[in-house]
Amino acid sequence: MTAVPPHHPTDSVTDRFLGHRELLFSVVYNMLGSVTDTEDALQDVWLAWSARHRKPDAEPVENARAYLVRIAVNQALARRAEMSRRQETYVGTWLPEPLTAADDHGAEGVERAEALSMALLVVLETLSPLERAVFVLHEAFGFAHPEIARILDRSPTAVRQLATRARRHVHARRPRHRPEADLHARVTERFAVAALGGDLRTLLELLAPEVTLWTDGGGKGPAVSLHPVHGRAAVAAVFMAVARALPAAGVDLRYRRVAGDPGALVFADGSPLAVVVVELTPEGDRISDVFSVTNPDKLTGIRPPAP
């Protein structure tokens, strides 16, 4: 969690930062898709915020929210370039780091209404950093274009152009639909049980014909393929093989929110083995995408199941 000094009720500088921390975390995470990099960015936001208030001649900040969001967005943009360089040498498919409810990153209060789905976060990876910033601020958090222009130090016209390009790009790759939450959770649970239990009949029932499996092991965790696997028969075969390869002692399956999605968490010997999220077809009756994160570096914040 972002380091801040011990909290005192009279410390208005700390209070004002903490009062906006959830918003800052959610904005930066949706821009980066990395919990670790988000925490690093928020640490630098706090350092800049506190350093400003240590100056004896500092002018008061009238709009702390706007001021902090601007710092946070600029920190995220700086880290975006570094992350892109890391991803160039990443082993296999890169997926966003799972942000789960009740994890160890102090993100329990992240504004879930604005948490983007795993599928949308994957699409946002194809935008330019500025397009992604504009899309996140406007579409997820409702910032007006003039306000975004001030945050990014761009003209309102330039921001509107970025917004149009980003929206067109996203909607071409991910048609806008949001499955009913209870249905999404039920399908996720049925799929997880079938996948780990080797239930071929249920897998074939749940998977859409053109389903795609995305697995992120980062060269460190189990990954069935370094590339996406396409097609119902191929994806079902993968999970049948996974079920046969599970440890004899079995695994512990739990369900938690993963950013904006219901998710399945797989534990072995008390340690996280995988986080799985499924995306449904627009009709909501089949699975169009399966996202599985097994890279242990991306699972460090996930708490083990209670005994």
Question: Model regions: which residues?
Answer:
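Short beta-strand edge/turn micro-motifs at domain boundaries
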Residues: 275-302, 307
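Flexible loop/N-cap segments at domain edges
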Residues: 237-254, 260, 266-267, 277-279, ...
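Helical hydrophobic small-molecule/effector-binding pocket
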Residues: 196-207
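Hydrophobic pocket/interface hotspot
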Residues: 203-204, 211, 285
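Active-site-adjacent scaffolding segments
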Residues: 1-40, 44-193, 199
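A short acidic/small-residue loop/turn micro-motif
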Residues: 55, 270, 294-297
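A solvent-exposed, acidic/Ser-Thr-rich amphipathic alpha-helical stretch
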Residues: 209-253
